[in-house]
Every structure is written in structure tokens, then in C-alpha cells.
Amino acid sequence: MEIRKSAVAGTLESSDVQIMLSAGNNGIEFELVSDVAKQFGDAIKETITDVLNTYGVTDAAVSVVDKGALDMVIRARAIAVVQRALDIVDTPNWEVL
């Protein structure tokens, strides 16, 4: 699916993650800011990429600011930002969830 508008989900509070999503041109491009990027950066990217793939998003610019979020929080924020960017908040795809 094609991203219709830029979107943000999450906060900059401790134990949360803020994900910003906008249209991209060359696949999925990440910008990750995290104190634990060396240890968990690949896992964070994998979780977000999994959500993007589930919704059929192939081109996106993803900016992530992690403040120690657990995987379930990252996944929930990723789902929220993708639904906002695809403008399907009012009609969620329950099979994806």
C-alpha cells in the first residue's frame, strides 16, 4: 500500500518509542536514535519492518526515537503509525491485527 500522509505515533517518555513514517522512494529506509541501538537496533528495525510488510508498505522513510520500549510497545506504535499514514484508522484491517 502507498503511504498517503506523514504520521507519528508514540512519545519521548521513558519506556516508549516515537515512530515517524513518511513516503519513501527506495524501499524502507531507517533512521534510528536509541541508547541501546548497538544491542537492540536490529530487533527494533525487524519489528517495525514486519508491521510494514504486513500492511504491504514497501517504500517508506522511518524515523525512530527509542527510549527503552519493549517489543510489544514498538509493535503497537508501528501499527498505529502505519494505520495513520495509510489513512485507515477508521477502517482497520482486523486480519492484520
Curated annotation (Swiss-Prot):
Keyword Thylakoid: no
Subcellular localization: Cytoplasm
Residue numbers bearing the O-(phosphoribosyl dephospho-coenzyme A)serine modification: 14
Keyword Coiled coil: no
Keywords attached to this entry: Cytoplasm, Phosphoprotein
InterPro entries: CitD, Mal_deCO2ase/Cit_lyase_ACP
A cellular-component GO term for this protein: cytoplasm
Pfam families: ACP
Main location: cytoplasm
Entry's family note: Belongs to the CitD family.
Purpose: Covalent carrier of the coenzyme of citrate lyase.
Quaternary data: Oligomer with a subunit composition of (alpha,beta,gamma)6.
Protein name as it appears in the record: Citrate lyase acyl carrier protein
Organism name: Weissella paramesenteroides (Leuconostoc paramesenteroides)
Recorded name of the encoding gene: citD
